[in-house]
Amino acid sequence: MTRRYWNINLEEMMEAGVHFGHGTRKWNPKMAPYISAKRKGIHITNLTRTARFLSEACDLVFDAASRGKQFLIVGTKNKEADSVAWAAIRARCHYVNKKWLGGMLTNWSTTETRLHKFRDLRTEQKTGGLDRLPKRDAAMLKRQLSHLQTYLGGIKYMTGLPDIVIIVDQHEEYTALQECITLGIPTICLIDTNCDPDLADISIPANDDAISSIRLILNKLVFAICEGRSGYIRNP
C-alpha cells in the first residue's frame, strides 16, 4: 500500500479537541500506548499516534476506493447522526446513523428482503400507487415505509456486504463491530481512551464524543475516499 500525504495537522486536531479522552477512572489499560498525559482528571490522547493511524486509514480507503470497493459508515448517536450522513453522502458511501438492527450484516438475506420491500414501497409512493389503496391499507404501508426509511435509508442502494466498515464509536456500535469481525470485514474505528484498540483492523485514537473531533476524522477519510474514487472513474 502506497503511503500518501493527507495534510493531517496536529494543531488542527488540538483545536477540534481530538486529544481529549475520558476520565482517568474510566479507561481501558490497553489504551496506555496511545495516551500521552493526564490533565485535570482526564486522559490526553497522543496526537502523533492519532496522525499516524489516521494516515494509515486514509491510505487504506484511498486504495480501496480506487479499486471500486464499497464502504459503510456507522454512527448512531443522535449528535453525530447528521455528520455521519453528510460524510457518507459526500463520498457516496452507505451509512447507518439511527439504529443498528441486529443481524444487519450477519443475516444479510433478511436485510436484503427488507431492502427489496423498501424499494418496492418507494416506487409505489412515487407512482401514486399508495394513494389508490384504501385509507387504512395506505396508512399502514406509509408507516412501514417511514420505518424502513429511518433505519435502512442510508443503505438503500447496498446490494451486498460492504468491503470496509468505518465505525465512529466502538462502545455504541459494538454489535456492528462484532458482526464485521464475524464476517471478516475490515474495520476502521475511532477509539477513545475507554475502548479496546485490538478489535478493529485500524484503530484511530480520538475523542469520539466531540462533534468537532468526529467531523475532522470523517473529513479526512471522506477526502481520501473521494480522491480514490476519482482515480477509479478515470481508470475503470
From Swiss-Prot:
Gene3D superfamilies reported in the protein's UniProt record: Glucose-6-phosphate isomerase like protein, domain 1, Helix hairpin bin
Source species, domain of life: Eukaryota
Single biological process term from Gene Ontology: translation
GO-annotated cellular components: chloroplast; small ribosomal subunit
First-listed, main subcellular location of the protein, grouped into a coarse class: plastid
SUPFAM superfamilies, per the entry: Ribosomal protein S2 (SSF52313)
UniProt-annotated location(s): Plastid, Chloroplast
Molecular function terms, GO-annotated: structural constituent of ribosome
InterPro entries: Ribosomal_uS2 (IPR001865), Ribosomal_uS2_bac/mit/plastid (IPR005706), Ribosomal_uS2_CS (IPR018130), Ribosomal_uS2_flav_dom_sf (IPR023591)
Pfam families the record matches: Ribosomal_S2
Record HAMAP family: Ribosomal_uS2_B
Name of the protein in its database record: Small ribosomal subunit protein uS2c
Organism this protein belongs to: Lactuca sativa
Biological classification of the source: Eukaryota, Viridiplantae, Streptophyta, Embryophyta, Tracheophyta
